[in-house]
Swiss-Prot record:
Record field: catalytic activity: ATP + H2O = ADP + phosphate + H(+)
Name of encoding gene: DRS1
Species of provenance: Lodderomyces elongisporus (strain ATCC 11503 / CBS 2605 / JCM 1781 / NBRC 1676 / NRRL YB-4239) (Yeast)
Biased composition regions of type Polar residues, renumbered to the chain: 181-192
Region (Disordered): 17-77, 94-192, 638-686
Protein name as catalogued: ATP-dependent RNA helicase DRS1
Lineage: Eukaryota, Fungi, Dikarya, Ascomycota, Saccharomycotina
Biased composition (Basic and acidic residues): 94-119, 651-673
Helicase ATP-binding domain: residues covered: 227-402
InterPro entries: DEAD/DEAH_box_helicase_dom, DEAD_box_RNA_helicase, Helicase_ATP-bd, Helicase_C-like, P-loop_NTPase, RNA-helicase_DEAD-box_CS, RNA_helicase_DEAD_Q_motif
Length: 686
């Protein structure tokens, strides 16, 4: 099979992970040199013939997989990124972490081999779970699923009550909100936009040429709705289903706008994303869409990659900067050659995800640095029924136009949702997961609630003989990219937390919810990793006894009829559970061995750091101290480095507002006098 077939056919693909991760393993000898815009233009032109060859091959592969379903007309399936291209500005970057790391696979392999020597052959017979499944179990689960579908309205009533409570807390009335938004509102169904083409959107030739070469001819609904409004310079609040092509929906109008801006050495557009991986994908898509535009430069400001190299790149004042919120603020404050004074367009991608990750303060700080009167703002969010989202919209946008494409709370039409009733058998979940993974053929993403659980599952499955990768916040940037590369190339199972729920754009056949998410919205984000662009996909969810899990199942059945109970051979599960219990000692040994190796590595890092501090002491001390906006706020609110609790902080703020702030510090004598006065006044009252 051709390597290109592994990628999903949407414009949001992350085709360049191979090149990034390969380069991150090598130490860069020099910092990124300052490139002129002319040189960048030549580099883009050198890629034309290469992209053309891959575009033709990908077009033929996409046509071979065409389906007659209506959904195929709604999504563009003629486009596919090529794995042969390079990321000019990222491939030689260093990662912030050292290349040295613990080889967990080797530790697991040794433990597995030692277990085999001690216990003999542990190979199990796969069996046929569909034939051996308990019929009574299946009937019970089917009846419960039917009942859940019938009682779906009851779940909605509960949600309506919660919504009423939220509405009571809000200060703004419906009339105020209506006045805040522009009168024009776009709420479009996919079928209404089938006939639209990019030519009808009146885009410039360089953009049309790049779209044509990439095989991208028919815009998705969100692109057809958003691009014309964005080209008018209006602010936009867009809500669309995950994987609907929103990356191109905001990149195309930005590039179109920059075509008519006179050459200037300043950054004109900033794109904010919640994760580094998504920022890398957006950078890749933008570079491909702008390959025929003269002197168009892209920059990145994300955590995990070398800070110095990013500073060198930002010195060139790239036209478009893709960033994560924290690193962008760091560069604005501490990189002297980088400025946001001339920014004309601000994109907030996956705003709901940013707020979930706790970036509210960072977003507020960025918005204060780029006043909304000077910029056009496009905000994209998968969900809008959130008070924090509404607050962010009012803070960041000026008379925005709403664009709502898909009906809320829906999942892809070709997704089959399967549910496994766990009941009170939580301890059997690893065994059930192993049984499923042995049966499934194709790439599978397993979602867990915590990174500790994800890591432990990797060890358990590894000791049982499965090769799996993990992706979560406890990993370094180098480890993340290496694991994504492995998942794309030779590993079929990726265990991850919600970090990757909206960051991966690799073709995935199965999504397993090992732990059910907290909300139905997060559930839709997770299962949205499969059944994309009109393809078929399957989600399998382990459902517990909590009301939270039950409500998610009710909503899933109500909004998608393709929901079934999956049959499980519980006798086979019990056998696998016995093996897992026998491996409990080995699991603890692997965790302990990994912990010791990590401590040794950390000690070596501290030693190297101390040596560097001594060796380069003068150079380090001569550098200006890096600042952070939160530190300055706390420094302003505290005295002599002492922490101020919320009660004292509020009292200090009230004194300032009333003009009663003390101009001196109370002495011991002052406090004694106050106590004496208080006692005398209390005696008089008596």
């Amino acid at each position: 099979m051709a390597k290109n077939e592994d990628l999903i056919l949407t414009i949001d693909s992350d085709a360049e992970y191979d090149n990034i991760s390969e380069s991150s393993e090598e130490e860069a000898e020099e910092a990124v040199s300052v490139k002129s815009k002319k040189k960048n233009n030549n580099n883009n032109n050198n890629k034309k013939s290469k992209a053309g060859k891959h575009g033709k091959a990908n077009l033929e592969e996409a046509e071979a997989e065409e389906d007659d379903d209506e959904a195929r007309g709604e999504m563009n399936l003629d486009f596919q990124f090529s794995l042969g291209d390079d990321l000019n500005e990222i491939k030689d970057w260093e990662v912030e972490e050292p290349a040295k790391d613990i080889d967990l696979n080797e530790i697991i392999k040794k433990k597995r081999e030692s277990k085999k020597d001690g216990n003999g052959d542990d190979e199990e017979d796969d069996g046929d779970e569909d034939e051996d499944a308990s019929e009574s179990e299946e009937d019970d689960e089917k009846e419960e699923l039917k009942a859940a579908g019938k009682n779906g309205q009851a779940g909605d009533d509960d949600e309506d009550e919660n919504e009423d409570e939220d509405e009571e807390e809000e200060v703004d009335t419906k009339e105020d909100l209506d006045n805040f938004y522009e009168s024009q509102e776009t709420n479009t169904s996919a079928s209404a936009l089938k006939s639209k083409t990019f030519q009808e959107l009146q885009l410039s030739r360089p953009i049309l040429k790049s779209l044509q070469q990439l095989g991208f001819t028919v815009p998705t609904p969100v692109q057809a709705s958003t691009i014309p409004i964005a080209l008018l310079g209006k602010d936009i609040v867009a809500s669309a289903q995950t994987g609907s092509g929103k990356t191109a929906a905001y990149l195309i109008p930005i590039i179109e706008r920059l075509l008519y801006v006179k050459n200037s050495t300043s950054t004109k557009a900033i794109i904010l994303t919640p994760t580094r991986e998504l920022a890398i994908q957006v950078h890749d898509v933008g570079r491909k869409l702008g390959q025929f535009v003269s002197n168009l430069n892209f920059g990145m400001a994300v955590g995990g990659l070398s800070l110095k190299q990013q500073e060198q790149q930002l010195k060139t004042r790239p036209d478009i900067v893709i960033a994560t919120p924290g690193r962008l603020i760091d560069h604005i404050r501490n990189s002297p050659s980088f400025s946001v004074e001339d920014v004309q367009v601000l994109i907030i991608d996956e705003a709901d995800r940013m707020l979930e990750e706790g970036f509210q303060e960072e977003l507020t700080e960025i918005l204060s640095l780029i006043p909304k009167q000077k910029r056009q703002t496009l905000l994209f969010s998968a969900t809008m029924n959130n008070t924090k989202i509404q607050d962010l919209v009012q803070l960041s946008l000026n008379k925005p136009i709403k664009v709502s494409i898909d009906p809320p709370r829906t999942v892809a039409s070709k997704l089959e949702q399967q549910f496994v009733r766990i009941r009170k058998r939580e301890e059997l979940k690893p065994a059930v997961l192993y049984l499923l993974l042995k049966k499934l053929e194709g790439r599978t993403v397993v979602f867990t609630r915590t990174k500790v659980e994800a890591h432990k599952l990797r060890i358990i499955l590894g000791l049982l003989g499965l090769t799996v990768a993990e992706l979560h916040g406890a990993l370094t940037q180098e480890q993340r990219l290496a694991n994504v590369k492995a998942f794309k190339n030779n590993v079929n199972v990726l265990i991850c937390t919600d970090l990757a729920a909206r960051g991966l754009d690799i073709r995935i056949e199965y999504v397993i919810n090992y732990d059910m998410p907290k909300t139905y919205e997060i559930y839709t984000h997770r299962v949205g990793r499969t059944a994309r662009a009109g393809r078929k996909g399957t989600s399998i969810s382990f459902v517990g006894e909590s009301m939270q899990d039950r409500n998610i199942v009710k909503n899933a059945i109500q909004f998608n009829s393709r929901s079934v109970a999956r049959k499980i051979d519980w006798d086979e599960v019990e056998k696998i559970q016995t093996k897992i219990k026998l491996n409990e000692g080995a699991i603890e040994e692997v965790i302990e061995e990994e912990k010791q190796a990590r401590e040794i590595m950390r000690a070596e890092m501290q030693l190297n750091k101390a040596e560097n501090l001594m060796k380069y002491e003068k150079e380090i001390k001569s550098r200006p101290k890096r600042t952070w906006f939160k530190s300055e706020v706390m420094e302003h609110l505290t005295k002599h480095g002492k922490k101020v609790n919320a009660k004292k902080r509020k009292a200090n703020e009230e004194r300032k507002e009333e003009g009663k702030e003390r101009s001196y510090k109370k002495t011991k004598a002052d406090r004694t006098k106050l106590k004496t006065k208080a006692k005398s006044s209390s005696k008089k009252r008596k």
